[in-house]
């Protein structure tokens, strides 16, 4: 059962855009937001904030009915998105490693996780797939 959807990823991967698409295309039947479980774990790594195993496990348990949608983008595309939007510079390597760390933790749990590359797929295509995942999972 999926009770909510969290859209995750580095800055400028298209999280907020996808939130709107999934919210609308799912008929607003399920809460959709950005920056949740995965960002909590990843940014604890980026900013050297200690997260105990106990806290991590409690977060994973609390998110058992969450669909985590992790958005990535090709590096050159991501760099261009940052540049043309005048976004503050980030250490791409550090942030990508932190999100990959969070991904490994989530994949080792019961939390449903899917990854999409926004350099390769449009928001509409991704939202269609996410809505299909929600429908299929909630039929079980």
Residue ranges with predicted function:
Residues 7:
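Hydrophobic anchor at the beta1->P-loop junction of P-loop NTPases
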Residues 10:
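P-loop (Walker A) phosphate-binding loop of NTP-binding proteins
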Residues 13:
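ATP-binding Walker
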Residues 16:
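Walker A/P-loop
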Residues 24-63, 70:
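Glycine-rich phosphate-binding loop used to anchor ATP phosphates in small-molecule kinases
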Residues 58-105:
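A glycine- and Lys/Arg-enriched "phosphate-lid" helix/loop adjacent to the NTP-binding pocket
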Residues 84-87, 100-140:
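NTP-dependent small-molecule kinase module
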């Amino acid at each position: 059962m999926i009770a909510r959807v969290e859209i995750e990823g580095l800055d400028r991967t298209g999280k907020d855009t996808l939130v709107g698409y999934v919210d609308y295309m799912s008929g607003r039947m399920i809460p959709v937001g950005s920056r949740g479980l995965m960002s909590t774990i990843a940014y604890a790594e980026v900013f050297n904030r200690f997260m105990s195993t106990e806290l991590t496990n409690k977060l994973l348990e609390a998110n058992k009915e969450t669909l985590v949608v992790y958005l990535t983008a090709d590096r050159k595309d991501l760099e261009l998105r940052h540049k043309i939007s005048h976004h503050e510079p980030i250490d791409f390597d550090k942030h990508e490693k932190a999100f990959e760390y969070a991904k490994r933790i989530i994949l080792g749990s019961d939390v449903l996780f899917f990854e999409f590359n926004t350099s390769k797929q449009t928001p509409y295509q991704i939202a269609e797939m996410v809505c299909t995942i929600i429908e299929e999972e909630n039929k079980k």
